[in-house]
Amino acid sequence: MNLCHVGQNGDYIMNEMFCFQCQQTAHNTGCEGKTGVCGKKADTANYQDELIGALIGLARAAENGNPTEKTDELVLKGLFTTITNVNFNNETIKKLKTEIEKEKGRINSEHFEDYDMTNIWDAHEDVRSLKSLVLFGIKGMAAYAYHSLVLGKTDREVTDFFYKALRLIGEDASPDALLELVMETGKVNFKCMAMLDAANTDAYGDPVPTTVPLTIEKGPFIVVSGHDLHDMKLLLEQTKGKGINIYTHSEMLPAHGYPKLKEYPHLKGNFGTGWQNQQSEFHNIPAPILFTTNCIMPVRQSYCDRVFTTSIVSYPELVHIGDDKDFTPVIEKAIECGGYDEDKEMTGMNGGHIVTTGFAHNAVLSNAEKIVKLVKEGKIKHFFLIGGCDGASPSRSYYTDFAKMTPPDTIILTLACGKYRINDLDLGDIEGIPRILDCGQCNDAYSAVKIALALADAFGCGVNDLPLTLVLSWYEQKAVCILLSLLYLGIKNIYLGPTIPAFVSPGVLNVLVEKFGLTPVDTPEHDLSAIMSAKS
């Protein structure tokens, strides 16, 4: 699987790859050969595997060693680096691995070998599946923990679990023990999402419902993609009074809902649609794009001189903004490019001209009494959560079609970049409650769960007894940790698509179906009929 050979100088010459961590993996079995579907080259994939192997060695060294905050940060950076569409740069991956090797020796005088990841890829399919669920889950969780760390919040239980999970991934373990670890991953990730929610709201206030235009005003502007609200705040501050407008892209859209970010009048609107459309939407764009996290795709010639990276994101030959967060090169490029000569009208994926965001748990639950009343009066019959990661697969039109088919007496919660499939639809409202409520970024699945738990409490029932159905889309590893949290919380009958993950073996899938009622999506008509019949 993870094939390579050693050259005369002792360096690995990486000829072939094996990677199946994202939804678009080739043939829904795994990317092999020289390039993955995401654009990642074989050598990059293998360097990332080596990086994970080094982290497992570091976790072993930390068990009876003396890890510090620096060690903790390296673990988060290492895991985050290997998330899909974060890092395509071999040099930064190798540099990070070298740092990890040095840290291993610093915290423990004993020698700890790096783990060979082919031990996982070549294991029994159920063991491989369960270890993959944990590994990909902690990759996603590391992103949330890193964003929290940047804002000054950490949690010892969360941090310690990364070490525990890495060590157990590198050990022989029974399927039962690994299934228990899978559930623990979901438990700890829920705590991690709560930590990030607190970090974001402490820093920027509780999100408020906000209408966001999709028109790009004439003049210089910067497009900001990714999830890092801290980077957004710093850029807004550095561009204040310079005549440069700021537009969100993809998962940065929820920034518009935070009061402390809304204070900046040059935070104008949202550029484009889902991340998967960036290569066409950024074609000849007269402005720079700043990637703060995933998803960056292979950068095309028509805009490569305008793309900047920061934080964990890295791509060969692009300008990277370092830890000093001096965005001067981005600002200068915006002035140089000049923006559009006239206002440019853009639309959402369904032709809409505005979207809304800011319906996090605080905003929605402030209307809980009204929502409960509407349910009791029969004016709201059902709630759907339609969201998750978006992607390029044509089958993802399922989510748009499903939303369009939902009855007018139902409410749709949405979140993450999967929202772009539906967030510009005009589905009206129910006595002032919009039928589409955008809860935020992928980590704001925490908000959706808090809303569900509060409604269950108000009705005196369990979450699974609510008129609520989760219809989720997945793409990368943050979706994995969210799914594991939902399973840990005992939320059942989740519809998952557009495909079942390649790393979920038939045996493990059978457990998820039997124990949790996990259901692969079929057609919108079939699934909606089944849902409404079951809840009636």
Feature-to-residue mapping (PLM):
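Anaerobic metallocofactor- and corrinoid-dependent redox/one-carbon enzyme cores
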Residues: 15-44, 48-49, 56-57, 180-536
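Short alpha-helical "patches" and their helix-cap loops
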Residues: 5, 94-99, 153-163, 464-470, ...
